[in-house]
Amino acid sequence: MESTTRTIAARKHIALVAHDHCKQSLLDWVETNKAPLSEHVLYATGTTGNLMQLKTDLPVNSMLSGPMGGDQQVGTLISEGKIDMMIFFWDPLNAVPHDPDVKALLRLVTVWNILVATDRSTADFLISSPLFHQEVAIVIPDYQRYLAERLPS
């Protein structure tokens, strides 16, 4: 597939997602990084987003709960170019009923070349990068060209 570039603005749109056993860890990370996160637009799956707002007072665009379609809502935003980065603290040792949605979400961040951290160490590296507060160009699939090649003229 051909590729093109997309510019990620200095003010990032960040998805925050956590499995049940990882929610407290993500909430602790958000609290620690409240100041830099406050400069960006935050999205989260339902339970995580609501807890985040209660504990940090940060504005969060909350989707549905992950198992109720929230993971898919975040995936849609990624596909539409509306998410620039995802912090997803997932539990690799416990299966969840919506594992196919989780796998699809991780596939989409890879397809669309979205920055993703699945643990605190990686999230710390992302948020401490000088690029976190800068405009950045990323390479993404050229979906318009992809469609043009497959549709009759």
Curated annotation (Swiss-Prot):
Active site location: D71 (proton donor/acceptor)
Domain of life according to the entry: Bacteria
Reaction it catalyzes: dihydroxyacetone phosphate = methylglyoxal + phosphate
GO annotation, cellular component aspect: cytosol
CDD domains: MGS
SMART domains membership: MGS
Function: Catalyzes the formation of methylglyoxal from dihydroxyacetone phosphate.
This protein's name: Methylglyoxal synthase
Organism whose genome encodes this protein: Sodalis glossinidius (strain morsitans)
